Regions:
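Walker A/P-loop
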Residues: 97-120, 279-280
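The Walker A (P-loop) glycine that initiates the GxxxxGKT/S ATP-binding motif of P-loop NTPases
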Residues: 107, 166, 275
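N-terminal accessory nucleic-acid engagement/regulatory domains that precede
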Residues: 1-68
């Protein structure tokens, strides 16, 4: 609510004797009065809260991925064995399936983990036959390659897949040294001073590759403006390929609204973390917070 209302212009018809202001605009001038802002945020928050359940229940699923239904080649027979074990476990413990899953997939390079993960996620889905998850990679340069692999190896269409590509260097997952933190904070403060309220910053700066599809009407009501389509695709597409730092914003953001999209995505989406052994112990602490969420 705060993020959306902060992007709006001042209400010229707002009547108030209050001399306190809530934020500034890009021109560094005072914008919304405090009481105007608080009332607007409350109204917007109430409206959005009524949609939260729909973010979980009305997002898109990939159903007919034919390759995942087929038997794996002999050298990758372990993929089907993993799926069979999951199916057997679910059949034997049907009364406890409301709980979450924590699965570790260990296999050597070239043994087919990419397709195996997709098969496993399909087996773990609520109906056992669909896909909806985030594939979080360790290296940004792999996102396009993995997106291509999903398109070609799994036969997934552009309407089922979104690939998030960053334009800047991969950020460290855990907090950097104190001196670097201070320098970064000063840069952020300068940026906020230049562009106005931190709540009005973009939710998703990076480029997102996706094909436009019809979105639920409620998403068009929640996300407005020139970046609405990108935000909607980030949330709506059945499979999202990105680097893990994009999802880390859900737990590591301390100011601004960068946590909003990854948090909403995780309401309805499973999470696959690729090559987790590439991360150092400090990174794993931050990853643990993400898994716990």
């Amino acid at each position: 609510g705060d993020h959306h209302f902060s992007t709006l212009d001042q209400n010229k018809n707002w009547q108030s004797q209050l001399a306190l202001f809530a934020n500034t605009g890009k021109d560094k001038r005072l914008k919304q009065k405090l009481d105007e802002h608080l009332c607007g945020v409350a109204e917007q928050a109430l409206s959005i809260s009524q949609y939260l359940q729909r973010f979980e229940s009305e997002m898109d699923l990939a159903h007919d991925v034919r390759i995942l239904k087929q038997k794996s080649p002999a050298q990758f027979a372990w993929q089907d064995k993993a799926v069979q074990n999951i199916q057997q476990f679910r059949a034997q413990h049907s009364d406890g399936m409301e709980r979450g899953w924590f699965v570790v997939n260990m296999a050597s390079t070239g043994q087919g983990k990419t397709i195996a993960n997709a098969k496993i996620m399909r087996a773990l889905s609520e109906d056992g036959a669909s896909l909806r998850y985030v594939l979080a990679l360790g290296l940004r340069t792999l996102t396009l390659q993995t997106g291509d692999a999903y398109r070609h190896s799994l036969g997934m269409g552009d309407d089922e897949l979104a690939v998030l590509i960053g334009s800047k260097a991969v950020l460290e997952l855990h907090q950097e040294a104190v001196t670097q933190q201070k320098a970064q904070q000063e840069e952020i403060q300068d940026e906020w001073a230049e562009h106005g309220s931190e709540s009005a910053e973009s939710l998703l700066d990076e480029h997102l590759e996706y094909a436009a599809v019809d979105m639920p009407a409620f998403m068009q009501a929640v996300f407005k403006g020139n970046q609405a389509a990108k935000s909607q695709a980030f949330l709506f597409k059945p499979v999202l390929v990105c680097t893990i730092d994009h999802m880390m914003a859900a737990t590591e953001t301390v100011r601004g609204g960068k946590y909003i999209l990854p948090c909403l995505r995780l309401l309805s989406s499973d999470l696959v973390i690729d090559e987790v052994d590439d991360f150092n112990p400090q990174d794993l602490v931050a990853i643990g917070r993400l898994v716990h969420l």
